[in-house]
From Swiss-Prot:
Protease among keywords: no
UniProt-listed GO biological process terms: D-alanine catabolic process
Family classification: Belongs to the DadA oxidoreductase family.
Taxonomy of the source species: Bacteria, Pseudomonadati, Pseudomonadota, Gammaproteobacteria, Enterobacterales
Known EC number: 1.4.99.-
SUPFAM superfamilies associated with the record: FAD-linked reductases, C-terminal domain, FAD/NAD(P)-binding domain
A GO cellular component entry from the record: cytoplasm
Source organism (scientific name): Erwinia tasmaniensis (strain DSM 17950 / CFBP 7177 / CIP 109463 / NCPPB 4357 / Et1/99)
Entry cofactors: FAD
Residues where FAD binds: 3-17
Identification of the protein by name: D-amino acid dehydrogenase
Pfam family for this entry, one: DAO
Role, per record: Oxidative deamination of D-amino acids.
Keyword flag Flavoprotein: yes
Name of the encoding gene: dadA
Residue ranges crossing the lipid bilayer per the database entry: none
Length: 433
């Protein structure tokens, strides 16, 4: 079967790889000159199935109000003038009760755990190297209340069979020795020993190279203007004056998926802006071993070979990718507080990207009402964590095979019929694809 994939981020490239492995003839189309140059370029670097959880959680609405008045708040909201943004936030608010939270977290953990297994199999099969580490991840609590509130997450982890360790403050340095300098500021932590880390952009680039060697055709510098529909199926992709045709079509355009699909199927995917710093390591012993997550500021600090990646925060501001100095200061503050001597912040690279988020936190993977149109988007802050599992799942669905995990509640069908009008982007004249 001929399959066209729109998007060459980690999700699109993983989809291409698994579809090619299933015997399909695959073409990937992207407006960028190379893979992983947008959202996959500078993410936090963590592969954390156990921490897969929706931003829509009990207590978040009240916290959001408090964060409005905090200098280093993990969440910021700026109205972009669209009804779509308001509707999306309302849908997110409706998912902030405990019932929805546990339901959403459970299915997010399901696909994330499966994805880690797929990544492990891929690594064993191909030997792909991406500065990965299998040292687990550690969520840090600064207050006793945060430590006690971890109970709701632990319940889901226990139900899903995810190994975990609840650590007292004195035990933190056993997992991360360099935290000795800041141990007195912490009340404890939740460690997930099976979690991993790695450079998402490097992984995507090397997987794309392997996909090319396996016969996948990449068409870069090719903006996508429209999907062409004929009755209940897609009949082509309009790229400038050219029409590209296939038997099946996959939209993996992250936050830009919504606009392209607007006249075909409504999906509630909205850009959640995030930031990162990439810092050269100056003292190996003062740097993290794996990933730590600061629960207070929602910031992750990840170790690559010779670099530290500090990423996090969320801004609901539309398609604005402006680098705000205040956000840089927050990232610098957190890494200085926890690892004051690990790297040279003066030589750090500052980055921002748009994470494609659904109101319930769960990605949109699988079939649509159109018989040959498939989606793989809406992974939010967990695109790297969920990429391989989503790609394998999609390849199984398109190939007519029974997936290894249940996919019934992952497709766009859970949002139909209809949703609400797509957003009008602040950045006009920029084609998707």
């Amino acid at each position: 079967m001929r399959v066209v994939i729109l998007g060459s981020g980690v999700v699109g490239v993983a989809s291409a790889w698994y579809l090619a492995q299933a015997g399909h003839e695959v073409t990937v189309i992207d407006r960028q000159p190379a893979p992983a140059l947008e959202t996959s370029a500078g993410n936090a670097g963590q592969i954390s199935p156990g921490y897969a959880a929706p931003w829509a959680a009990p207590g978040v609405p009240l916290k959001a109000v408090k964060w409005m008045f905090q200098r280093h708040a993990p969440l910021a909201i700026r109205l972009d003038g669209s009804r779509y943004q308001l509707e999306w936030m309302w849908q997110m608010l409706r998912n902030c009760d405990m019932r929805h939270y546990q339901q959403n977290k459970s299915r997010m953990v399901r696909i994330a755990e499966y994805s880690r297994d797929c990544l492990k199999a891929l690594r064993e099969q191909t030997g792909i190297a991406y500065e990965g580490r299998q040292g687990g991840t550690l969520q840090l609590f600064r207050t006793a209340q945060q430590f006690e509130s971890a109970a709701k997450d632990i319940a889901v982890l226990r139900e899903a069979g995810v190994p975990y360790q609840l650590l007292e403050a004195a035990q933190l340095i056993e997992a991360e020795p360099a935290l000795a300098a800041s141990q007195h500021k912490l009340s404890g932590g939740l460690r997930l020993p099976n979690d991993e880390t790695g450079d998402c952009q490097l992984f995507t680039q090397r997987l794309a190279e392997m996909a090319m060697a396996a016969g996948v055709h990449f068409r870069f510098n090719t903006p996508v203007d429209a999907l062409l529909q004929d009755a209940n199926q897609i009949c082509g992709v309009q790229c400038g004056s050219e029409r590209v045709t296939a038997d099946a079509y996959v939209v993996a355009l992250g936050s830009f998926s919504t606009e392209l699909l607007n006249h075909i199927v409504k999906i509630p995917v909205y850009p959640l802006k995030g930031y990162s710093l990439t810092i050269p390591i100056t003292d190996e012993k003062a740097a993290p071993l794996s990933t730590v997550l600061d629960e207070t500021y929602k910031v992750a600090i990840t170790r690559f070979d010779n670099r530290i990646r500090v990423g996090g925060m969320a801004e609901i501001v539309g398609f604005n990718t402006q680098l705000l100095p205040a956000r840089r200061k927050t990232l610098e503050m957190v890494v200085r507080d926890l690892y004051p001597h690990g790297g040279d912040i003066g030589r750090a690279t500052f980055w921002s990207g748009l994470r494609p988020m659904t109101p319930d936190g769960t990605p949109v993977v699988g079939r649509t009402p159109l018989k040959n149109l498939y989606l793989n988007t809406g992974h939010g802050t967990l695109g790297w964590t969920m990429a391989c599992g989503s790609g394998q799942l999609l390849a199984d669905i398109i190939s007519g095979r029974t997936p290894a995990i249940s996919a019934d509640d992952l497709s766009v069908i859970r949002y139909l019929p209809g949703f609400y009008p797509a957003p009008v982007r602040a950045l006009h004249g920029v084609n998707v694809g």
